């Protein structure tokens, strides 16, 4: 792409278990602006660095000033081994790949948390009767290739993201069917986290397990096929998605309690926008609120689905600003 000058431009990325998204960031205005956000399939590249180099070559840009890349996995000593892929990436290898002056990795849901307070109404789909008030702490969570979670602490005008690995907390069954689901998964894995169900691979397992429990034969389908068939009205797949939405509601409510997210819960990730109508129609909100003695607490918390696919890129751009750097330092 001609006409771009590397001065004042940065690269932001969002790399998960399936997709790698990149954009350039222009800091000329009051807020950072994304330029040419682009998504690639991770399986098309040998390494994360290959994908980054391909994007920069496509944009015709050499040596942007800085990079912030949001990654799906815990970061230790400036490096990540992705939880749901074989890729590895470090801040040093990122810096070398793009010729950046500075390069930083942040957790993908930390990026989601940085973006959440800045999302416009068009970026969100309200689930339930309440709208966000702009006050109170937030929880940001959601299923994709894995399950991510983060918090946003807001005090006296200062926003501080809380990085977590909340997708790996234990799955807590709600009824007899979910107890049977848990038994199957414990036999298979020894321990069952919410990510074992609330993810693309988890949805595929859930579909087969529900068929076994209910004594009906089901085809082994991908998560994409299950969601598409459910939205189209397929009864078998709709049962799976309804259960998926219910379990997601329970997990979201648990994380809202754990993070004290009275300001709102944002459901992000690649799956929720594709099933948003079923989330709204099903038991998601009822299960979110069903917290026994704390049900009044969760009943007062707004829930929204994040519909903008570039939210983590927005959050990575925020991390480049002085306030963002201070928040995650």
Curated annotation (Swiss-Prot):
The domain of life is Bacteria
Q: Which UniProt keywords apply?
A: ATP-binding, Cytoplasm, Glycolysis, Kinase, Nucleotide-binding, Transferase
Q: Quote the EC number.
A: 2.7.1.2
Q: Where are the transmembrane segments?
A: none
Compartments it resides in: Cytoplasm
InterPro entries, alphabetically? Answer: ATPase_NBD, Bacterial_glucokinase, Glucokinase
Q: Which GO MF terms does the UniProt record name?
A: ATP binding; D-glucose binding; glucokinase activity
The GO annotation for biological process reads: glycolytic process
N-terminal signal peptide: none
Q: What class of enzyme is it?
A: transferase
Per the record, GO CC terms?
A: cytosol
Reactions catalysed, as given in the entry? D-glucose + ATP = D-glucose 6-phosphate + ADP + H(+)
Record Pfam families: Glucokinase (PF02685)
Which residues are recorded as binding ATP?
A: 13-18
Q: Which family does it belong to?
A: Belongs to the bacterial glucokinase family.
Know the name of this protein? Glucokinase
């Amino acid at each position: 792409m001609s006409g771009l000058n590397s001065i004042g431009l940065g690269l932001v990325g969002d790399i998960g278990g399936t997709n790698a998204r990149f954009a350039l960031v222009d800091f000329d205005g009051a807020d950072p602006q994304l330029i040419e956000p682009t998504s690639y399939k991770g399986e098309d590249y040998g390494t994360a660095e290959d994908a980054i180099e391909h994007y920069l070559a496509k944009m015709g840009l050499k040596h942007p000033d800085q990079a912030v890349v949001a990654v799906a996995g815990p970061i230790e000593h400036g490096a990540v081994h992705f939880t749901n892929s074989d890729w590895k990436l470090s801040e040093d290898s990122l810096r070398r790949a793009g010729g950046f002056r500075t390069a930083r990795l942040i957790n993908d849901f930390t990026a989601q948390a940085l973006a959440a307070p800045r999302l416009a109404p068009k970026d969100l789909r309200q689930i339930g009767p309440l709208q966000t008030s702009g006050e109170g702490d937030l929880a940001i969570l959601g299923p994709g290739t894995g399950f991510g979670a983060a918090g946003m602490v807001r005090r006296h005008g200062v926003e501080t993201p809380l990085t977590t690995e909340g997708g790996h907390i234990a799955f807590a069954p709600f009824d007899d069917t979910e107890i049977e689901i848990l038994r199957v998964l414990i036999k298979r894995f020894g321990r069952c986290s919410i990510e074992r169900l609330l993810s693309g691979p988890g949805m595929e397992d859930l579909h087969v397990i529900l068929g076994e429990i209910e004594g009906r034969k089901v085809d082994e389908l991908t998560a994409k096929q299950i969601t598409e068939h459910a939205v189209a009205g397929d009864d078998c797949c709709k049962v799976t998605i309804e259960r998926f939405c219910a379990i997601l509601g329970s997990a979201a409510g648990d994380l809202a309690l754990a993070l004290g997210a009275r300001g709102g819960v944002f459901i992000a990730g690649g799956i929720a926008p594709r099933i948003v109508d079923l989330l709204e129609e099903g038991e998601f909100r009822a299960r979110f609120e069903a917290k026994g003695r704390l049900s009044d607490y969760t009943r007062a918390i707004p829930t929204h689905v994040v519909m903008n696919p570039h939210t983590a890129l927005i959050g990575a751009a925020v991390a480049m600003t002085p306030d963002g750097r201070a928040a995650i330092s």
